[in-house]
Every structure is written in structure tokens, then in C-alpha cells.
């Protein structure tokens, strides 16, 4: 899908989300967990942007901030040109939430166990006061059929379904209001491989049918390569590299991206060349106390003295290939 | 290479209202000394129950070994009592569990947990055991091993805890290491560290590994031979190269084509339709028949047996019956 000259649907400008650390008798603020620390990118209509990174890199927080489940500490979120970073809950519900929906990671925790599928999927209609009762029920059955579940399942409860089926229910719920943008936070990582493929194929079909835009958050680099048009790599709350998927996987510029890609185990055919693996030393530093300068310099195999001092700028190193690294400035 | 572990026709059943539920239903395989064998399958395929049966840990969760034998060198583990097992667990056979978050004791320090094994199995004095524990921690890549000894598990990250688990598992130089999804809960860069470490250590001590995983990438990197399980049965047994080059069983083929690859493009993923049947509701014929794209009439009614295909690979599928007959 070419999304190059399509309209921008969502834009993030230097968005930060800090969570305060409180301690002591009066619960005074003693510091911040910098979960998302200055992230800028834009999403074009109809494209899929994949966000990858290790746990704790802020990819989920970024996703949740975009849909305004969290209020950003700083920065602007523009949805179709409108700044939604400071809107009140009521205004959000009226103007934005209909158009941005979310699919969550854990299909066992994200569905209310006391409600039937019908009332789970119908709930957005109630909230937004759409359609008559009868139309609502018809819509529910239509949606269930669309995601590959039998419409007669509408009266059942979530516990009667397997993980893959529940994720389909989560997708049906996200589709109820005909959104333009769906934020999918690790939608397939809790599923078995054969089921994972079913859900990925379903998401691709739906995208074509409803002209959806996806923000696909995942730690699985192979899945992200399969589904995305462009991919962003996050590390400790910062975007390290962002470019088209072919460019990113064939020609990664940032040392972190290179290490990340090389550590993915691949199914290797006999006779094929074994890739050189870059094993990173140490662990992800705590986002409450990120390293000075480039956040990656503590684990970087090619760190220079300047990396300890100065934060590298996130800029275009090659046409539409953005990278935050001193090697390319 | 001599055989270290031999599992023959193992059947482990669980019971619900006296109804038997066959979680593992006739599994045969062997592991040679120094070999890494991967046990692959989706959740519910019985791979973890197979490993728990070897460790003698199914009885405590209500399971029962109904039939078959598990031979570790010349000892038959199925006839072992709990006391006998205590002597070999951690000593000759040890296990790394999937959840590094829950498999360490939260109220004991790392040092206490490592020395416990050494004092029990190797009759070491406390001081001696401490020294050895520090060495072990250094071996698994901790630079400040002395401090780590005094830490509690909650102070460590997932990757560090998994390395501690590996240190404990290898503390008595076991002959067999069972690793149940050792890297599933870890990030890729940490996963690479842990896999690298397991490989190094096993070469050094000539330990055999039974690696249980659903990640075919990990299998391809780390294993010598692969056993594919489906619904409590072995459906294919082959070397890594053979399996990835030419999968025989339709289920193996489905698994291989349903994963997106990182170094290439697939237009549309080939999803296996349907889902794994539960062990209390198995189809009467071949257990994969309802999901199989190549199912024939007899697949729905008859159960295929494990056939020996040319080149010594085994596969449980009627498609290869003709070839198998020619062979024998």
C-alpha cells in the first residue's frame, strides 16, 4: 500500500509522558519515570506503522498516550490537525474516541467476564447513542460474522472462548464505531503460532476492507516486518530509528537496531550463511534514571566520547530514513 | 554417541471426575549424550507434561503415568519413589522453568538458593558452597557476583533471574538439563545472551539438553534434533536441517509456513484453520485430521502410527505409509 501522498491522520510532536515517583511521609515527588521522552512521528491514512522495542522501552505507553488513555506531560498530539493533547474527557468522547480504537494484548483480561459477547460489542453503541436496539443487535451479529465467529455466539460469555477467538472479539469491539485508526498493542503475542497467523491475516483483510490505519505495537520483529509499511524502533522512551520496513530490515543504521535484528533467532535452511550475531552486554537501564547523552551509549558497541555527553538529534540520515545517532550527524 | 535418556510409549493421564484425560499419549524418543533435542508444539500439545513426567513432578499435580518407561542411562525413572527422585533432581537431571519471575523463592537470597543445592547434593561445607556459588554466578555472566549473592530475586530483572536459574540448574553438572521455554518471557537481546550461554556451558560440560519451546527460530539456532508434538503424540522426529528443509507432516509444514520470517517477505501467512482440540475431546481418527489440508477419508477414522521414513526420520501420517511399506 502506498501511503506517501496521503493525508496525515495522526501526528505526535515531541510527546513526553512522565510518571511521578513519590515517596516519604507526604508522598512528595522525588523523580520521574520517563516512559516516553520526546517522541515525534506521523501516521498517514491507510498505512500500518509498527513500533518495536524491548519491554520497558515505552512503546505501550506511547500507544496509550496517543489514544489519550494517558494525558501527555508535554508535547502535542494532532488528530487530523486538531490538538487533542489537552481535550477534556467529554470532548474526547464526542470527537475523537469514535475514530481511534484500541486492541489490547491480553485477550483474557481485556474482556469483561460477566458480560455476554453481545453486550461487550454493543457497549460502544450505547455510549454514543447510535442505532435502535434492533439495529444494534443486527450490527453485533454482522461484526461477529466479519471477524470469523458464528453470530449465534453472541449470547455466550468470554470464558467459553479460546485465546484466538477472544482476540477476534476484541477486534470486533474495536471495529464497532467504524474507526479510522486502530492502535493494536501486542495483539498476537499471547497466541499460539498457528492462531497468530489467523489473527494477522484477519487484521490485514479488515484493513483493506475498511481502509483502516494501524499502529501496531509489538516486540516480535518478524510479525512487525510482515504487517507494517513503516517501522519505528524505540529504546528507553525515545525513538531511535524510523523508516520504511524494507529499508529498516535490509539496511538498519542505528547500532541498537542492528543488534536487535541480529539477535532474533531465524529458521535457517541448510547451507545458508550463519549471520553474525551482535550480543548486547548488560540490560536495559531504568527509565527512572536514564543514562546521560545518548540513552543507548551504555550498551552500544561503537559508542564514542560524544555519545556520553550529547543527546543525538532524531533526523533524516537518508531520504525518509530517520535516525537518532551521532554516527550519522 | 550413547543414549542418555530413553522414553518409551509414555502415557501420562490426568483425571476429571474419574474420566481419564490423555495429556501425553504414547510418546517415544531418546536423547544422546551431549545432544540438544527440541520438543516443539503449541500449548496443549503435552510437551510440558512430558518434561514434568521425566522429572517426576506430575504426581503432585494430579497426573499419573499409566504406561511406558523413562530410562535415564540404566535407571528406570517410572519405578522411582519420591525419595529416589530427590537424589537425582538437581543432581543428574535439572530443570529451568519458563517463568523466571515465579520460579525463585522470593524470601531467600540468591546465595542461599544456589548453596542449598550444593550443600544437599555435593555435601559441601557452607563456606565451600559459597565459593562455588560465586564461581557459578560469574560463569553465567554476572560481573558483581559477590553482591548478587546477597540480593533477593525481586531486585533482579527477568534476564538476570533466568541466568540465576541456569546457574542453579548447572551447579551439580547434571547429565540432562530440561529447559521449559527458557527464553519465552525474555526480550530478544536478552534471549540471545541466554541461548549463547546455554550453548557454551553445555559444550563445556557435555550436558544433554531437552529444550521445550514453541519458537521455531530458537529451535533452529539451538537444537540438533527436533521432536514435533501434537495433542499428546509425537508427529515428527527429525534433525533440524531435515525438518526445516523438508517438513514431512502437514502439521509441521503448517507451523513452518504460519510464522512470518524476518529475512524475507511472505505475501499472506498460511494459517492452520481451527484450533488445537482439548485432550478430553479428541477426534477419533488422526488428531490433526480436522485441521489438515491433506486429510484423506481414512484419516477421519483410523489413527496413523509412527512410521519410519527413509533417512531414519519418523513421522505419524498416512501420506507416508506407502513409502514406509516399501522400505520395510
Curated annotation (Swiss-Prot), chain A:
Bilayer disposition of the protein: Peripheral membrane protein
Superkingdom of origin organism: Bacteria
Gene Ontology biological-process entries: establishment of competence for transformation; peptide transport; protein transport; sporulation resulting in formation of a cellular spore; transmembrane transport
CDD domains linked to this entry: ABC_NikE_OppD_transporters
PROSITE patterns: ABC_TRANSPORTER_1, ABC_TRANSPORTER_2
Every ABC transporter domain range: 10-261
InterPro entries assigned to the protein according to its UniProt record, in alphabetical order: AAA+_ATPase, ABC_transp_ATP-bind, ABC_transporter-like_ATP-bd, ABC_transporter-like_CS, Oligopep_ABC_C, P-loop_NTPase
Record carries keyword Ubl conjugation: no
Subcellular location(s) of the protein: Cell membrane
Residues the entry annotates as binding ATP: 53-60
Role summary: This protein is a component of an oligopeptide permease, a binding protein-dependent transport system. This APP system can completely substitute for the OPP system in both sporulation and genetic competence, though, unlike OPP, is incapable of transporting tripeptides. Probably responsible for energy coupling to the transport system.
Family: Belongs to the ABC transporter superfamily.
NCBIfam families: oligo_HPY (TIGR01727), PRK11308.1 (NF008453)
Name used for this protein in its record: Oligopeptide transport ATP-binding protein AppF
Organism name: Bacillus subtilis (strain 168)
Lineage: Bacteria, Bacillati, Bacillota, Bacilli, Bacillales
Gene: appF
UniProtKB/Swiss-Prot annotation, chain B:
Domain ABC transporter: from-to ranges: 5-256
One of the record's GO molecular function terms: ATP hydrolysis activity
Keyword ATP-binding set for record: yes
Entry membrane topology: Peripheral membrane protein
Record flagged with keyword Metal-binding: no
Subcellular location: Cell membrane
CDD domains: ABC_NikE_OppD_transporters
Domain of life: Bacteria
PROSITE patterns: ABC_TRANSPORTER_1, ABC_TRANSPORTER_2
Disulfide bonds, paired cysteine numbers: none
Chief subcellular location: membrane
Keywords: ATP-binding, Cell membrane, Competence, Membrane, Nucleotide-binding, Peptide transport, Protein transport, Sporulation, Transport
Family per similarity comment: Belongs to the ABC transporter superfamily.
Function statement: This protein is a component of an oligopeptide permease, a binding protein-dependent transport system. This APP system can completely substitute for the OPP system in both sporulation and genetic competence, though, unlike OPP, is incapable of transporting tripeptides. Probably responsible for energy coupling to the transport system.
Annotated protein name in UniProt: Oligopeptide transport ATP-binding protein AppD
Amino acid at each position: 500500500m502506498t501511503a506517501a501522498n496521503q493525508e496525515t491522520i495522526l501526528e505526535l510532536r515531541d510527546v513526553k509522558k512522565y510518571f511521578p515517583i513519590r515517596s516519604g511521609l507526604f508522598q512528595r515527588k522525588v523523580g520521574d519515570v520517563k516512559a516516553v521522552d520526546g517522541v515525534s512521528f506521523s501516521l498517514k491514512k491507510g498505512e500500518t506503522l509498527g513500533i518495536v522495542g524491548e519491554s520497558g522501552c515505552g512503546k505501550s505507553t506511547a500507544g496509550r498516550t496517543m489514544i489519550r488513555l494517558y494525558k501527555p506531560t508535554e508535547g502535542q498530539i494532532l488528530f487530523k490537525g486538531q490538538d487533542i493533547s489537552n481535550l477534556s474527557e467529554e470532548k474526547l468522547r464526542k470527537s475523537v474516541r469514535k475514530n481511534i480504537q484500541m486492541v489490547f494484548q491480553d485477550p483474557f483480561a481485556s474482556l469483561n467476564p460477566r458480560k455476554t459477547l453481545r453486550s461487550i460489542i454493543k457497549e460502544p453503541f450505547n455510549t454514543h447513542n447510535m442505532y435502535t436496539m434492533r439495529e444494534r443487535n443486527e450490527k453485533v451479529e454482522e461484526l461477529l460474522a466479519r471477524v470469523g465467529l458464528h453470530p449465534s455466539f453472541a449470547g455466550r460469555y468470554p470464558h467459553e472462548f479460546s485465546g484466538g477467538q477472544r482476540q477476534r472479539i476484541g477486534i470486533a469491539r474495536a471495529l464497532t464505531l467504524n474507526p479510522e485508526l486502530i492502535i493494536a498493542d501486542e495483539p498476537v503475542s499471547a497466541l499460539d503460532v498457528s492462531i497468530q497467523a489467523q489473527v494477522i491475516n484477519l487484521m490485514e483483510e479488515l484493513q483493506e476492507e475498511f481502509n483502516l490505519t494501524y499502529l501496531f505495537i509489538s516486540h516480535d520483529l518478524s510479525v512487525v516486518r510482515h504487517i507494517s509499511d513503516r517501522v519505528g524502533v524505540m529504546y528507553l522512551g525515545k525513538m531511535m530509528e524510523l523508516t520504511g520496513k524494507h529499508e529498516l530490515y535490509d539496511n538498519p543504521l542505528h547500532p541498537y537496531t542492528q543488534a536487535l535484528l541480529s539477535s532474533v533467532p531465524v529458521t535457517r535452511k541448510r547451507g545458508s550463511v550463519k549471520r553474525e550475531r551482535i550480543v548486547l552486554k548488560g540490560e536495559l537501564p531504568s527509565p527512572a534514571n536514564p543514562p546521560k547523552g545518548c540513552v543507548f551509549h551504555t550498551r552500544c558497541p561503537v559508542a564514542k566520547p560524544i555519545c556520553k555527553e550529547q543527546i543525538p538529534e532524531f533526523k533524516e540520515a537518508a531520504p525518509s530514513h530517520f535516525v537518532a545517532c551521532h554516527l550519522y550527524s | 554417541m550413547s543414549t542418555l535418556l530413553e522414553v518409551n510409549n509414555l502415557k501420562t493421564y490426568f483425571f476429571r471426575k474419574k474420566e481419564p484425560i490423555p495429556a501425553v499419549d504414547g510418546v517415544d524418543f531418546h536423547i544422546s549424550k551431549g545432544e540438544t533435542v527440541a520438543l516443539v508444539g503449541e500449548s496443549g500439545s503435552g510437551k510440558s507434561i512430558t518434561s514434568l513426567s521425566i522429572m517426576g513432578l506430575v504426581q503432585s499435580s494430579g497426573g499419573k503415568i499409566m504406561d511406558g518407561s523413562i530410562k535415564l542411562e540404566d535407571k528406570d525413572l517410572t519405578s522411582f519413589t519420591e525419595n529416589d527422585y530427590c537424589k537425582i533432581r538437581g543432581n543428574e537431571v535439572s530443570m529451568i522453568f519458563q517463568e523466571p519471575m515465579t520460579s525463585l523463592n522470593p524470601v531467600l537470597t540468591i546465595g542461599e538458593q544456589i548453596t542449598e543445592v550444593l550443600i544437599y547434593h555435593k555435601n559441601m561445607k557452607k563456606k565451600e558452597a559459597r565459593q562455588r556459588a560465586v564461581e557459578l554466578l560469574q560463569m553465567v555472566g554476572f560481573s558483581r557476583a559477590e553482591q548478587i549473592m546477597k540480593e533477593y530475586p525481586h531486585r533482579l530483572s527477568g534476564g538476570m533471574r533466568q541466568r540465576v536459574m541456569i546457574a542453579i540448574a548447572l551447579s551439580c553438572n547434571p547429565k540432562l538439563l530440561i529447559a521449559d521455554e527458557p527464553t519465552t518471557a525474555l526480550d530478544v537481546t536478552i534471549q540471545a545472551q541466554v541461548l549463547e550461554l546455554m550453548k557454551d556451558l553445555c559444550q563445556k560440560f557435555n550436558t544433554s539438553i531437552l529444550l521445550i519451546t514453541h519458537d521455531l527460530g530458537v529451535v533452529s539456532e539451538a537444537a540438533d534434533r527436533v521432536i514435533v508434538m501434537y495433542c499428546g503424540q509425537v508427529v515428527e522426529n527429525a534433525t533440524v536441517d531435515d525438518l526445516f528443509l523438508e517438513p514431512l507432516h502437514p502439521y509441521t509444514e503448517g507451523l513452518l509456513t504460519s510464522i512470518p520470517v524476518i529475512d524475507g517477505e511472505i505475501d499472506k501467512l498460511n494459517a492452520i484453520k481451527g484450533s488445537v482440540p482439548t485432550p478430553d475431546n479428541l477426534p477419533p481418527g488422526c488428531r490433526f485430521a480436522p485441521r489438515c489440508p491433506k486429510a484423506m477419508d481414512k484419516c477421519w477414522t483410523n489413527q496413523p502410527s509412527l512410521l519410519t521414513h527413509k533417512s531414519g526420520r519418523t513421522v505419524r501420517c498416512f501420506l507416508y505409509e506407502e513409502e514406509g511399506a516399501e522400505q520395510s
